[in-house]
Amino acid sequence: MANTKSAEKRHRQSLKRRARNVTVRGEVKTAVKSAREALGSKDGAKMTDAIKSAAKALSKAATKGVLHKRTASRRISRLAKAATKAARAQA
């Protein structure tokens, strides 16, 4: 347990940050999962909307510092690549 006032404060801060990070990570996970599911569907508009919302969630998480900038960029890139592949398969 924390022995000093500053350590207690840092612990409180870390708990707040952890709660915030868990929420943001959950939102990102949900957005990416729905985008992956949309890739399997035949609806092109649904697919592009899902990819856009996932990319937005990933970018926001990177801006907030929850995800590293390059991690978010890599995930967005992979989603876009999968979307292109799915679009070609449908055509």
UniProtKB/Swiss-Prot annotation:
InterPro entries referenced in this protein's UniProt entry, alphabetically: Ribosomal_bS20 (IPR002583), Ribosomal_bS20_sf (IPR036510)
Designated name of the protein: Small ribosomal subunit protein bS20
Region feature Disordered, mapped onto this chain: 1-25
Encoding gene (name): rpsT
Keyword Glycosyltransferase assigned: no
Pfam families from the UniProt entry: Ribosomal_S20p
rRNA-binding recorded as keyword: yes
GO terms of molecular function: small ribosomal subunit rRNA binding; structural constituent of ribosome
Record keywords: Ribonucleoprotein, Ribosomal protein, RNA-binding, rRNA-binding
Biased composition (Basic residues): 8-20
One example of a Gene Ontology biological process annotation: translation
SUPFAM superfamilies the UniProt entry points to: Ribosomal protein S20
Family label: Belongs to the bacterial ribosomal protein bS20 family.
GO cellular component entries: cytosol; small ribosomal subunit
Function: Binds directly to 16S ribosomal RNA.
Organism, as annotated: Myxococcus xanthus (strain DK1622)
